[in-house]
Amino acid sequence: MGGCVGRERAETRGRGSRTQRKRGGRNEPLKKDKPKWKSDYPMTEGQLRSKRDEFWDTAPAFEGRKEIWDALKAAAVALECSDHELAQAIVDGANITLPHGSLTECYDELGNRYQLPVYCLAPPVNLISERSEEDLTDNPEPQTAQKKEFQLKVRLSTGKDLRLNASMSDTIGLLKKQLQAQEDIDISHQRWFFSGKLLTDKTRLQDTKIQKDFVIQVIVNQPAPNH
């Protein structure tokens, strides 16, 4: 397994190449259609999540600028959640050029090339839903169970990482209020994502299958200041 992962990482590590590109080249609008692909083996949601986390955690260590990687990650999440307008705004705001209208090949304003693997843009067609197993054994825990709190890792689209006191029974709506109180970010400007999925206010953490070491992404959508 390690050999396969190592080979895949090597194949996708042209990501922040020094390949230079002349400015003023072709720049296509971001396409709305999501890439369709099939994994070599049926992949669970957890495996896909781990694969994506590995890429995003290591990509900035290679060529390219961290702020561009952060923008590409936010754009990829928005695009997978069918928020094409937000994804395009993120790309435009970071001055990212798309020669083919896809995040699989991008350039920053300095001409550095960035390549995103397809698994960061869409789940495979043979993805195994972990939710189905839970539905078969749907035994709600009694409300009398002791509430166990932990430090939830949250990463803002601004690049800031922070922690919130949370329990698995907390709803996203409740956590949004906590983030608002802690960081002064209006609830209406918060969009919470996990494993490429938009989390609604009524969603509970236990429904997301999140574990303590995982990170929830929060896109902060605030109006740009007038110049």
UniProtKB/Swiss-Prot annotation:
Pfam families linked: UBD, ubiquitin
What does the protein in this record do? May be involved in the regulation of cellular senescence through a positive feedback loop with TP53.
Gene3D superfamilies registered for this protein in UniProt: Phosphatidylinositol 3-kinase Catalytic Subunit, Chain A, domain 1 (3.10.20.90), Ub domain-containing protein, DC-UbP/UBTD2, N-terminal domain (1.20.225.20)
- Supply the SUPFAM superfamilies for this chain: Ubiquitin-like
Task: Specify the Ubiquitin-like domain's residue ranges.
Answer: 150-225
Q: Where is this region: Disordered?
A: 1-45
Q: Where are the transmembrane segments?
A: none
Q: Where does this protein have compositionally biased stretches of type Basic and acidic residues?
A: 1-14, 25-39
Q: What name does this protein carry?
A: Ubiquitin domain-containing protein 1
Basic residues bias located where? 15-24
